[in-house]
């Protein structure tokens, strides 16, 4: 049985973030959740969390950067499109035991579906490795730009138009 759980961190406490951190062996800082306005989608199979992905609206991310007084174009290597009707998809994680079984594709499908429901015009993401690049490319995302982030790591900016 597959259950899909949605958590809007704006309305929930840190428990879901703690659970996500433990499930995927990362710290809260590595999850890089943005100011309690992230939608976290978890995929649960037989009561076990096997994957998760995060979405934030471009407007919310942009507003957050302004409040921090950060450069509009870059925040820790995250580049934004200037259009307002977009969703940023990030922090996709799949439990190592379930990799290679289409979990990442399913999480991405759900993210695109939620983005359509929310009336976003496009989604975008940053791919930091060949596996994530392949997953997004397979789903129909286009390469927009390649660059190095503030940590000198190669990044691909990829986009997907929903309309």
Where are these regions (language model features)?
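Conserved acyl-donor/pantetheine-binding loop and adjacent beta-alpha core of acyl/acetyltransferases
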Residues: 49-91, 151
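Conserved short alpha-helix immediately C-terminal to the canonical SAM/SAH-binding motif I
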Residues: 107, 131-132
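Short alpha-helical
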Residues: 11, 130-131
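Conserved acetyl-CoA-binding loop-helix of GNAT-fold acetyltransferases
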Residues: 94, 100-113, 138
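Conserved GNAT acetyl-CoA-binding A-motif
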Residues: 115-128
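Residue-level recognition of the GNAT/N-acetyltransferase active site
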Residues: 90, 95, 128
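Conserved catalytic-core motifs of GNAT/GCN5-like acyltransferases
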Residues: 124-126, 142-157
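Short amphipathic alpha-helix that is part of the acyltransferase structural core
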Residues: 1-30, 35-59
């Amino acid at each position: 049985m597959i259950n899909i759980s949605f958590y809007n961190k704006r309305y929930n406490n840190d428990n879901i973030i703690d659970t996500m951190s433990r499930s995927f062996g990362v710290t809260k800082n590595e999850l890089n959740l943005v100011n309690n306005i992230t939608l976290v989608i978890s995929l649960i199979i037989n009561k076990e969390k096997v994957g998760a992905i995060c979405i934030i609206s471009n407007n919310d991310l942009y507003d957050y950067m302004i409040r921090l007084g950060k450069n509009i174009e870059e925040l820790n290597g995250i580049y934004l499109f200037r259009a307002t009707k977009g969703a940023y998809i990030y922090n996709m994680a799949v439990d190592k035991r379930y990799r290679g079984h289409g979990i990442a594709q399913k999480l991405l499908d759900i993210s695109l579906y939620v983005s359509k429901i929310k009336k976003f015009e496009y989604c975008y993401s940053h791919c930091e490795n060949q596996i994530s690049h392949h997953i997004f490319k397979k789903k129909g995302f286009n390469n927009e730009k390649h660059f190095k982030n503030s940590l000198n790591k190669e990044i691909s900016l990829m986009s997907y138009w929903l309309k």
